[in-house]
């Protein structure tokens, strides 16, 4: 039991849990004889209680017995059913409602785990998708073990005491270390997946870096602080000293869940023109809004001591599964719609300056410009009068040969003379810090690209396309070495038309002269014709 939720004074309120002197004049019916009884002179009665709370049998035998209950027992029963708490007897906290809520969460978690393992796929987000599947499997396994232990405990209490109590189920959340460890690992992985989802919502590399650093730090801090009190209950004697930590960590988790829900809902509002066009996408969007709001909603309801108080761990696991899996599916479908719209648009997709590592777009543009400049200068030096359109063609060999980075190092200018000076200690320290920062950013970008996905400008081919190309090459016989495909093309030169016009002019001149000229013209025509052929 968490002391920050319930104070000890609320539990000591039932008089039937204390011994009561009934006095004399009581007849007790013998269990083996129907029409016999024993007269008792002095009787002390005390109800069966567990942790200073009476245990009642939820059956229909209350009014069927001809004997009445004691006044203290009746008063305690009326008080018991008015307590809206997990130690009370209200209908919300009856054993039937608790079992129904636990099994419902178990069914939802297993269903979403199956969907995550079968339906959701993505080669660009392979690492984070594997983490999501592992987290879903851990959550399903944890709830399976939890329900098994609950049923065994209820069976034991039914056989020993003849009653089943919802109160005993609540102790499993904090006393069972298997549930605590698996819940800690599943929650940690789900929050890492939520960090990956938020990273996918943004396009700039700098924004992804900031989200990665802040999200990982907040996730690790919140989960480590959350798991300290359950472990302290089993390792230290002063277990009540750590209970003061839980309300602050609970508020911390509420803030993280609210931030995640706010970011997702804001992105949904920004993309309303896409998902509003399709009915199925609209229903999935409404479901996404509902599930991302359930997590902070259940946190607040658990703190406010409503029906799910002390059942929050089961509901939190289900909320983490739904808010992660359904949001991931919605984001995948939204990306498909965005790619279709960008393909039909004139502008296409946006390209940011820092989208590629090491400024690949800028370097490629510099290489192309340098190669074109060198090609034009070489053509001008060899033949200044021959201007052809082929001089503007830039082949890959020329681009790869002339690289401005091979001649001018990064960070140096051609108009400045550099010496091998070590500089001051401040400059060296700043240089070392800058180098360390660049390395950290580099590894961060590698983690983000490999786990969350590639950048927008990277052209990645899927496996199916490669398989189809390999099949076509095999059918054509191109998989063998030394085999190529050539395409025929008709080429017309401008010099052919000029030669034909010159030949016609010479024929006209030869027909005007005499027979001697005719012989010469025929020889000339023949030689010209042969030369033309």
Swiss-Prot record:
Gene Ontology terms describing biological process: ascospore formation; cellular response to alkaline pH; cellular response to pH; fungal-type cell wall biogenesis; invasive growth in response to glucose limitation; regulation of vacuole organization
Biased composition (Acidic residues): 495-513
Disulfide bonds: none
Location in or out of the cell: Cell membrane
Entry keyword annotation includes Transit peptide: no
UniProt cross-references to InterPro entries, sorted A to Z: PalH (IPR014844)
Alphabetical UniProt keywords: Cell membrane, Membrane, Phosphoprotein, Transmembrane, Transmembrane helix
Side Cytoplasmic, residues: 116-127, 200-209, 269-280, 329-533
Highest taxon listed in the record's lineage: Eukaryota
Spans within the Extracellular topological domain: 1-94, 149-178, 231-247, 302-307
Coiled-coil zones: none
Record region (Disordered): 452-473, 494-533
GO CC aspect terms: endoplasmic reticulum; plasma membrane
Phosphoserine PTM sites in chain numbering: 409
Membrane topology, record value: Multi-pass membrane protein
Polar residues bias: start-end ranges: 516-527
Main localization, broad class: membrane
Transmembrane segments: 95-115, 128-148, 179-199, 210-230, 248-268, 281-301, 308-328
Pfam families cross-referenced by the UniProt entry: PalH (PF08733)
Protein task: Required for the proteolytic cleavage of the transcription factor RIM101 in response to alkaline ambient pH. Required for growth at alkaline pH.
Family recorded in the similarity comment: Belongs to the palH/RIM21 family.
Name under which the protein is recorded: pH-response regulator protein palH/RIM21
Originating gene: RIM21
